[in-house]
Amino acid sequence: MLINCKVGDKFIYHAGKLLSKHGYFHAEDLKLKCHVVEILDDAIILESNCSKKNRYYMTEETKELYEKEEN
């Protein structure tokens, strides 16, 4: 298990950190709110709070881009 969480937990995805690594420095502070929709053996699937079409996959390689929101 990547981190201790359950379906419905809220996270902030620091997408700007990933984008800035690829040269998009203007997006460095981009943060997206999302919530856990499914937990797999090797990944956690999160869905955007704004758009049900956007899904993000937290893996061992990307888990530092996510910050758990405290309720």
Model-derived regions, located:
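A detector of low-complexity, intrinsically disordered, Ser/Thr/Gly/Pro/Ala-rich segments
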Residues: 1, 10, 37, 57-60
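Intrinsically disordered, low-complexity, charged/polar segments
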Residues: 47-71
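Basic/aromatic-rich interaction segments and small domains that mediate binding to polyanionic partners
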Residues: 20-56
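Short linear sequence elements within intrinsically disordered, low-complexity coil regions
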Residues: 16-18, 29-30, 61-62, 71
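Intrinsically disordered, low-complexity segments enriched in small/polar residues
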Residues: 9-12, 22, 54-55, 64
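Surface-exposed loop/turn positions
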Residues: 6-9, 43
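Mixed-charge, Lys/Arg-rich low-complexity intrinsically disordered regions
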Residues: 1-7, 14-19
